[in-house]
A protein has these predicted regions:
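Alpha4 helix (beta4-alpha4-beta5 surface) of REC/receiver domains from two-component response regulators
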Residues: 81, 101-118
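A short, hydrophobic beta-strand element within the central beta-sheet of small alpha/beta folds
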Residues: 92-104
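Conserved phosphotransfer microenvironments
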Residues: 33, 66-88, 99
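Negatively charged, flexible loop motifs adjacent to catalytic sites
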Residues: 52-55, 75, 101-105
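Acidic, metal-coordinating helix/loop segments flanking the phosphotransfer/catalytic sites
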Residues: 49-67
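Conserved phosphotransfer cores of two-component systems
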Residues: 61-63, 85-92, 113
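A Lys-centered signature of the CheY-like receiver
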Residues: 121
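Non-catalytic signal-transmission and effector/linker regions of two-component phosphorelay proteins
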Residues: 1-39, 43, 66, 88, ...
């Protein structure tokens, strides 16, 4: 388990509560999604949970999300099609793909289908928060 750097920790403390960082969590298991979302919301992120690729695409039509967190089965062709569609809909969003095996082959598949980074399942909420904070530093340098 990695520890967030001091810079990232200070960024979380300074995060403005009226300006949440919107993220979309695509997780078919709503119990897991609710648990992860509560940890992210406690850290100051605005999380929208969607249980299917279709509902996630619909949500993207209504709002812009700085980050897309996708729980994916890379062996499922429909999942890869969904990753492509999510990337086309939000080319500037940062896409984090969580999969059971995050090896070099999985990273290559994820990058080919529009993902920016790969994390292993089960998701470590602290690691995910550190990654989102690091992205937020790059996305909003005026903070």
């Amino acid at each position: 388990m990695s520890t967030p750097s001091t810079e990232v920790i200070s960024m979380r403390i300074r995060r403005h509560p009226t300006s949440p960082f919107p993220a979309l969590l695509l997780e078919p298991n709503l119990a897991n999604a609710a648990q992860l979302a509560s940890r992210l919301q406690a850290a100051g992120f605005e999380i929208r949970i969607e249980g299917s690729a279709e509902s996630a695409l619909q949500a993207q039509r209504q709002s812009f999300f700085f980050a897309l967190i996708v729980i994916a089965d890379l062996a499922d062709k429909d999942c890869l099609v969904a990753l492509d569609a999510l990337r086309r809909r939000s080319p500037r969003s940062w896409m984090i793909v969580a999969t059971s095996n995050c090896d070099d082959h999985a990273r290559n598949v994820i990058h080919r289908h529009g993902g920016d980074t790969c994390i292993s399942l089960p998701i470590d909420p602290d690691d995910l928060i550190a990654r989102l904070d690091a992205f937020q530093l790059r996305a909003r340098p005026s903070f």
